[in-house]
A protein has these predicted regions:
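C-terminal active-site/capping subdomain that shapes the small-molecule cofactor and substrate pocket
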Residues: 2, 226, 238, 242-326
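N-terminal Rossmann-like NAD(P) cofactor-binding subdomain of oxidoreductases
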Residues: 2-195, 319-321
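Active-site-lining helix/loop region of Rossmann-like oxidoreductase modules
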Residues: 3, 7, 11-18, 27, ...
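Short clusters of hydrophobic/aromatic residues that line enzyme substrate/ligand-binding pockets
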Residues: 64, 129, 144, 185, ...
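Generic structural signal for residues in well-ordered beta-strands
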Residues: 71-73, 224, 305
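Short alpha-helical
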Residues: 99, 124, 208, 249, ...
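Hydrophobic alpha-helical scaffolding
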Residues: 148-149, 202-204, 281, 309
Length: 326
């Protein structure tokens, strides 16, 4: 049985805890975060998005007990000092966001873990592997991998499929729920807009999606522009693509392309729908992207494509998929 530890118990780390605690093929042996254990137990039990934990959960000295299983709870800020060797940890899920370079992530390896799976796009010297796209490129010798982020996992499949027709340019706006890297009330921030009240404003932010997509799809280098617009909701996202193709197409052709992909080689990764969804409807959806066929529009060779995704639940599903490959 694979032995797992989670470093960083923010939104992604806590959701992974909830989803892995009863996994029959994985043993969650430890979590690490600088927050106090009783506070961690509280946040694991009561979640403002996904509701109350379905089972028993309580804090013990140095541990969290969930559904009768005891998970060691550590508070070590230096990953090199974590007891991964003693705990025989196979894979560390690095969810803190603070150790995404190879040098930083290798601290977990030096501490005794066999492998590290980031929860974000890592530095350029870490393989960027998107599940459902290039997961077969993973080698047994690779100890640190990056699965991209939620936006990369949504966008990669869409652009790859459309590039079968031929893409001349892509403009992408990710309408995304606010995150912990924004302020709830106006406050100082090195990125001024992120310092504005997240629940009261529509806030454009810069993202590195373009760079990630160009790493994965080098044929599109210089053809992609992206931005994220943070909106006053706590969960969910909608990717808005404006794509110029090499040739004219139709709404029917584009929708058929994605409906076919969702039913076949991308089953479980892409979902296609013609239901009149809103962001609340995709909470808990496990797909990397949900193509909304009702919102597809085409003018000549210009395509407007809309895809929903649960930025937390969909992405943690892909991280769990990766554990099956490691």
């Amino acid at each position: 049985m694979m032995r797992i530890a989670i470093n960083g118990m923010g939104r992604i780390g806590r959701l992974l805890f909830r989803r892995l605690i009863d996994n029959k093929e994985i043993e969650l042996v430890a979590v690490n975060d600088i927050m106090e254990g009783d506070n961690l137990a509280y946040l694991l039990k009561y979640d403002s998005i996904y509701g109350t934990f379905a089972g028993t959960l309580a804090h013990q000295p140095g541990a969290i007990e969930a559904n009768g299983k005891v998970v060691k709870a550590l508070q070590q800020p230096n990953p090199a000092l974590l007891p991964w060797k003693d705990l025989q940890v196979d894979v560390v899920l690095e969810c803190s966001g603070s150790f995404s370079s190879r040098e930083a992530a290798e601290q977990h390896i030096k501490a005794g873990a066999k492998k590290v799976l980031l929860s974000t796009t890592g530095s350029a010297d870490i393989p960027l592997l998107v599940y459902g796209f290039n997961q077969h490129a993973l080698t047994k010798d690779e100890t640190i991998i990056s699965p991209g982020g939620c936006m990369t996992n949504c966008s990669t499949h869409i652009l790859y499929i459309l590039n079968a027709i031929g893409i001349k340019s892509v403009q992408c706006n990710i309408l995304h729920s606010y995150t912990s890297r924004q302020e709830l009330v106006d406050a100082p921030h090195k990125h001024f807009r992120r310092g504005r009240a997240a629940a009261e404003a529509i806030i454009p932010v810069e993202i590195d999606l373009q760079q990630s997509l160009e790493r994965l799809l080098p044929v599109l280098k210089g053809k992609i522009a992206s931005v994220s617009t943070r909106v006053p909701v706590a969960n969910g996202a909608m990717a808005d693509f404006t794509i110029q193709l090499e040739e004219d197409t139709t709404r029917q052709e584009i929708n058929k392309l994605f409906a076919t992909a969702a039913a076949n080689e991308y089953k479980g990764i892409i979902e296609y729908t013609e239901d009149p969804l809103v962001s609340l409807d995709i909470k808990g959806n496990t797909h990397s992207c949900i193509i909304d066929g009702t919102l597809t529009s085409v003018v000549g060779n210009h395509v407007k494509l809309i895809a929903w995704f649960d930025n937390e639940y969909g992405f943690t599903t892909r991280m769990i998929d990766w554990l099956g490959k490691m």
